[in-house]
């Protein structure tokens, strides 16, 4: 599929308090049309700075930007991209933010209509003209229905909940039929329930409109809910990027693993083991295993297989299965009991089946 966003070897530098700061360093990111692409990192990682180069709200120092096949920035071969051309380009990229930036003195309806005040369309002769008042009103009405706010059109921002305010911001961001929607920490100010509702809305809009979504966040749970691809940033650099499924199945960087652990109930269970006597109570011929598996592996009776093949017994302490992009991912925490030879054979079987596992409680003495 064709990339709608190409950021090639981008660097962003600026002076702050008398020193040169490199906010983004040699970052390359290609986002395909129709992606929901999560860019995750802690505060100061450079993720917002990077993504704001997409519509040139932040001008890079070095590198190249190509949007929908059009080069809009090239540090080696400068591109003239200013004035009316830049304004028209930016209309095709919607943005929502952590803070909703609504106009307090305007109604919900007029907040959305505000984004249409300079909007133009082509007439049947190919000439551009401004929208009529009726066309603007019809467009706003359509957008408010799309974000489930049709019955709140005459309300003011002060009368709305946080989730409703963000819905207004989303409607406003969609006013000019953008091909790209950027969410810059768009759920950070919301409670968990409202966050899920907004993510469901973004997913629905993505499906209905075919819009490409770029999701900036410091929360892996947000990425996990709706993204199909992920880039992880640290200290201005993209340290890892892949499909959501591959990131969760085979994370390479320590930071990526940390982010994944924040979304995993199995990791919370493992962390709680230190407060129990479970590890101390393991028999001499048993050990505690954490096992991860995904996709077709879930269809195979792995635990049943090892008990039959290798003369070991198991006791499951924890189990969980969840879906990522429609693909199941599972975790087990279980004891493996048997002779050292048989336990070693069972673990070799895990390796043979390409299952990820770790020994949580490893014994020093075995009884054969």
From Swiss-Prot:
UniProt xrefs under Gene3D superfamilies: 3.30.70.260, P-loop containing nucleotide triphosphate hydrolases (3.40.50.300)
EC number annotated for this UniProt entry: 7.4.2.11
SUPFAM superfamilies per the UniProt record, alphabetical: ACT-like, P-loop containing nucleoside triphosphate hydrolases
Membrane topology (UniProt): Peripheral membrane protein
Binding site for ATP: 41-48
Enzyme class per UniProt: translocase
Statement: the UniProt record of this protein carries the keyword Thylakoid: no
Subcellular location: Cell membrane
GO molecular function: ABC-type D-methionine transporter activity; ATP binding; ATP hydrolysis activity
Pfam families membership: ABC_tran, NIL
Domain ABC transporter stretches: 5-260
Reaction catalyzed: L-methionine(out) + ATP + H2O = L-methionine(in) + ADP + phosphate + H(+); D-methionine(out) + ATP + H2O = D-methionine(in) + ADP + phosphate + H(+)
Predominant place of localization: membrane
Domain of life: Bacteria
GO CC annotation terms, alphabetical: plasma membrane
Keywords, comma-separated and alphabetical: Amino-acid transport, ATP-binding, Cell membrane, Membrane, Nucleotide-binding, Translocase, Transport
Primary role: Part of the ABC transporter complex MetNIQ involved in methionine import. Responsible for energy coupling to the transport system.
Membership in a protein family: Belongs to the ABC transporter superfamily. Methionine importer (TC 3.A.1.24) family.
Subunit relationships: The complex is composed of two ATP-binding proteins (MetN), two transmembrane proteins (MetI) and a solute-binding protein (MetQ).
Protein name: Methionine import ATP-binding protein MetN
Chain's gene name: metN
